[in-house]
Amino acid sequence: MTTPSETMEERIRRAEVLVEALPYIRRFSGHTLVIKLGGAAMGEDLDAFLQDVVLLRFVGMRPVLVHGGGPEISLWQKRLGLEPRFVNGLRVTDGPTMDVVKMVLTGKIGPELVARIHTLGGQAVGMSGEDGPTLMVRPRGTEGGHDLGFVGEVDQVNAEPVEAVLDQGRIPVIASIGLGVDGDAYNVNADTVAAELAVALRATKLVLLTDVEGVRGADGELVSVLDAATADRLIESGAISGGMIPKVRAALRALDAVTASHIIDGRVSHSLLLELLTEKGVGTMVTR
């Protein structure tokens, strides 16, 4: 269906977009893609992103969605009289803070994402790394002399619960919480969770959505393709810093399984499709 004001050139361009995507759809059909949605990227274009995820499922791909929720967790901490504290970018997670993490990720953000996917025509199942359990973790312990509390590092991934959801034709929506051997829940970096899941699932792609264009080099320009050696140099020089460091390290870790990792700007409408189904892409592709 076209609109009365739509020109023939615009209609032809729509068809050309579909034709351009066809080789990529053929290449990735039946393949697993792990996509991490950060809290900072959950903005006005969230529905456009979720439409992309639903479309990928409909054309035969197997998307897995991992979500964080840092800004929302901090917001609820403050509402409940708890002061957010960070050490080297890691949230200090005492008992009350862990309760907030679980409440926000599994009681608010996860269900909202699942509901939006259903509204957009897809089928999704909300999960936590505790379910199955999917993510077995160990306490991270201290950072810079500070006790991080219930912050975990992934020890083992059980991919079976996620694969079962994928085999049903549904989209797993996974909160970045893991289960410790002590039976306690732990807060785990969502980039790390996505990378470890990508390896365990033998995924073809890992995509990390963030709120910047991608990785920038020493000259401040966007790096379209980043290899491991260059990434190490940029981290050592300080060109890659702050929250981008764990993203790049996660992207590199996933290369044990995936053909390429991608760090893209979640604020750009349909950035996921642009990165995966067009020749040029819109972010940084990380390769060996």
Which functions belong to the PLM regions below?
Residues 1-267, 276, 280, 287-288:
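Nucleotide/pyrophosphate-binding catalytic subdomain
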Residues 273:
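Conserved N-terminal glycine/acidic-rich loop preference
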